Amino acid sequence: MAGYHDEQESINTAKHIWHSGGKWVVAVLVAGALGYVGYVAYQGRVHQGSAQAAQLASQVKGDAAKLAALQQQFPKDTATTQASLQTAAALFQAGKLDDAAKAYQWVLANDKTPVFQAAAMQNLANVYIQQKKFDDALKTLAAPVDATYQPLINEAKGDVFAAQGKAKEAGEAYKLALDKLPENSGNRQLIQMKMSQL
């Protein structure tokens, strides 16, 4: 009889817990499980989207129309940013400066990764130099950039001033670039050569 009484007491305790908040415990556990399943599904979609973006990015190969489609379909994917930078460089080499500028502008607007921002700024400034849009180049280079990449931006400013025939300003910008570059940087010689040609 004592075993029956202990068993009945356990059942009553379980009922009491269930009625006094046990439903919430179960609800929290179910919500947690659903959240986890949702997270796993989301990660699967992100991975699948990245794989699709990478596949499409490999097919762009300098085609501005394909790049625009990729940018629209996968605007937040790193593969899209990389394809934009590569396509912009190919378009620049082909003399399609307006299309190259659009690709660099897209990177500046859509990917805030410091290295991509710096690369797009520097290269967009080079496009503007070729188009003789010196004010646009300097405006592009005036945007904030991670301190790590400031020497590249200063060098690009020097290039803009040099293209305008402003030797003093170019020299100052190149000096700023040199001052912030590490001593073992391979870019130092190039900047020193540019300074000597002013």
Task: Give the residues covered by each predicted segment.
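TPR-adjacent "capping" and linker segments in tetratricopeptide-repeat scaffold/adaptor proteins
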Residues: 40-50, 71-77
